[in-house]
Amino acid sequence: MKPYTTLPGVAVLVSLLTQSAHAAPFPSRADVVHTREQESAARPQPIVYKHERGVSNEIQYLPPDPQGHPTIIPFPTHISYVTFNSRPGAIHPPYPHLDISEASFKAEDSTCWYRGKPCEGVPHIPIVKGFDSIEKRSPAPQRHPPAPTKATAGYQFTNCTSTSNPGPTATSPTSGIPSQPSAPPATMAGQDIFQPIAKDPIPANIKSRDDHPVKANHIENPTGPISTNKFYANFFLGNQTSTTFTHPYTMIWAKGDKNASSFGMAISHVEPSQRATGEPNNKLPGNPVRYYINPVGIKSLVLSASELKESTTMSVAKPQAFSAQAILRPTGGSSESITFPLVQGMGFITAIYNNLQPAIQSAVLFRKVEPAGSPQGGIFKYKITLEDDKNWLLYVIPENGADPKLKLEGNKLISGPTGFKGVIQVAKNPSAEEGEGIYDKSAGSYATDIKISGSVGTDGTGTYKFSFEKAGKGAPLVMYALPHHVESFDDATKNTKKNMKLSTTTKGMATACVGDSWTMVEGNLPLSMDFAPWKPGSSSQVTLSEGAKNAIKAVAGNELSQDMELQTNLNSMYFSGKGLNKFAGAIYTVQELVGDKAAASGPLNSLKESFKRFVDNKQQIPLVYDNVWKGVVSSGTYEKGDTGLDFGNTLYNDHHFHYGYFILTAAILGKLDPAWLDANKAYVNMLVRDSGNSVDNDEHFPFSRAFDWYHGHSWAKGLFESSDGKDQESTSEDTMYAYAIKMWGKTSGDKSMEARGNLMLGILARTLNNYFLMKNDNVNQPKNFIGNKVTGILFENKIDHTTYFGANLEYIQGIHMLPLLPNSAYTRSAEFVKEEWEAMFASGAAAPAEKVTGGWKGVLYANLAIIDPEASWKYFAQPSLDLSSIDGGASRIWYLAYAAGEYSTYIAL
């Protein structure tokens, strides 16, 4: 992967440093670190950081392979940039970057200064000379393995840090929204999936702390659990100046931005034609581009007030799973305010003014603003055309019903009456008169929240419903549905669709729907799926042949005799969980599928002891209960001050990955020994409540921390500000979590949890194949991108076909494969796997699997079992198998069983 790409006329940073990272599964140093001798002279060197804020230089995990050699080594992140082809420094992202100049450029002409000298193209955090609105700040600590203490390639520099001022804390009461709350949605037929998990107290051996590294300074009345991984988090994190993506709109606090000269709320909507793309990959069929990114910071409209100046504050109120409120005040504690209800999919951007003079601005510039009458009583409509030829509608609903008589002052400002109380709404209109008619009928109404209900029937059909809470005039709501919603609408909801669509940043076209609820249906849920290998459509459990059993017995002794404590008692919840689950799957295979209980007995007892260490909270880095945001987190950051320890666990990164492995391990332990459940059930339920709670009234944990029921998948990023929004890299570990709670629910007797896991798997099977796993006929991602087959890392604002730990194809594709589990063939369709294999890993393809080295090779061949179980079996059963190709979080025992389970004929050695 090239560390930079020059695009004429484009000044866009694509930096993986600013995002939440995902740990890789045990590649070796040689896989990811290139020396100068290995690189061609023409290829720019990767940038290696000597130290990154938030990334520990300690070796977090060194489990031995069967020969006793480490199978994971710390390695650097490959960094990628889109930079300038002229005038470096003219526009600066406030993150580490590399300016590439033309040969004729003079360093002294740069507006970027580094360490007191003009920028000469070195990687750095910019200190912008003469641009006060751009602040220096350090990248958010990210989830990738620690950087090596000695750089092995490329440039070296020490990262800078700065602490942003959190700003004043709002102390006045929350601005009220006149709501029309709906009754809790009625439970649908079948098993209710949102029943409370047993509400045990936090175990006494998990200490409570009130000093979380990230303060809730910008949240109003932060008393109960606060959602940490949701779409609006940028509004209360860092400088509060990164974008929030409501889909299809984007919102950003202007906060004195010089382009808009405003402290109001900026709104934009990006068309596909505005995207920037990366370089084509000529090694893949179709030469797909490596990434695409939507521009941020376009301020098509800004809803502000003349009173909003340098003293303006923004706070967030009522943060929920689907909604929140962003509140602007002229000064902290002021009763005058503008309140913005934030709800995923909202058709209007709504601003509720309380005694302020509206100032509606545009950095794109107004070409035409014309009054357009009153579509409803008390509503005043204006039609706006901007200089980019885009059409917007503006509706004013004064509390007193009087004509606001908005005035256009130049091409940047529309002013309203002083002391205005009422509602102003804006919406982009892509559909001319038809679009106007749709918006006109719903103007004055706005969503304030979404209530969700759901059930799963015994026939394998799951249903979930969004009931929109609203306020205002009472008209039916305009809400935008993503493609996976539209695909799964029931018949009644299909009738709410309108002939109006707006593009989203990374999920295709959103469809306008008019109504106060949606109901989605997922059929063919994997109710029969258990711990054994499983095939879609199968209603029975796999029985292994005698040949397969004998082959597994022959290798079981080596793996089950490994030092379990050494591989599970680690200073990382993530890697400890992977180690525990590795042994759990192997023990289950030997005891239940092979039928050798004697061989499994000793390792089973060892696994119980290893798990008990965590239940007793005596692992290397114990858990604590965070009493600020409300959750169970690693104590590492509290003790060492490094927010990147255990990949940001303390700041709620990736809890569904980390805790999912523990939950799945517990499900297997409880299956193998039901008596084990009594002493351990409360601990495991605590992990489920933290990462994926089923209710919103639990005093200890928020509802559904990771899984986003609107987007249909999880977000991995926690309390880190991010210019491109939330993101997720490993779809397969997302499905692992859903499978884990399904199986823990089954083992522990929680029917609601089991049903919820089944429905989550069904939703994931749909969303992953719409947005992440791209078959040739995918219509939601750009045609020039789908040849990559997987997204790599999907953000709310961009998609980059890479990983946080390297750009080898086996890394990028493989992180969407592991861990191989019974659910893998359900969410990774055979059609997709076949297309991906032929394009990437077949003999003669871009990266033939037979030439891959290390643990990724085993991941690829285990994945091959979905379409060619015979070839997969032969690879793992070969007597001369290179054991280093078995990932440290997997076992040969399970890989053999998985291939045999998918193989429909008798396996003879």
Curated annotation (Swiss-Prot):
Gene Ontology molecular function: any one: glucan endo-1,3-beta-D-glucosidase activity
Signals that turn on the gene: Expression is down-regulated in presence of human keratinocytes.
EC category: hydrolase
Ranges for region May provide specificity for triple-helical beta-glucan: 798-800
Stretches the record annotates as beta-sandwich subdomain: 191-430
Residues annotated for (1,3-beta-D-glucosyl)n binding in this entry: H658, D727, E729, E733, Y811
Composition bias type Polar residues, residue spans: 155-180
Signal peptide positions (record): 1-23
Spans annotated as Disordered: 136-187
Keywords: Carbohydrate metabolism, Cell wall, Cell wall biogenesis/degradation, Glycoprotein, Glycosidase, Hydrolase, Polysaccharide degradation, Secreted, Signal
One Gene Ontology cellular component: cell surface
Catalytic activity line of the entry: Hydrolysis of (1->3)-beta-D-glucosidic linkages in (1->3)-beta-D-glucans
Annotated region (alpha/beta subdomain), positions in chain: 431-524
Domain GH81: residue ranges: 191-909
Enzyme Commission no: 3.2.1.39
GO biological process: cell wall organization; polysaccharide catabolic process
Predominant location category: secreted
Keyword Transmembrane: no
Function: Cleaves internal linkages in 1,3-beta-glucan. Probably involved in cell separation after cytokinesis.
Family: Belongs to the glycosyl hydrolase 81 family.
Name of this chain's protein: Glucan endo-1,3-beta-D-glucosidase ARB_01444
Origin species: Arthroderma benhamiae (strain ATCC MYA-4681 / CBS 112371) (Trichophyton mentagrophytes)
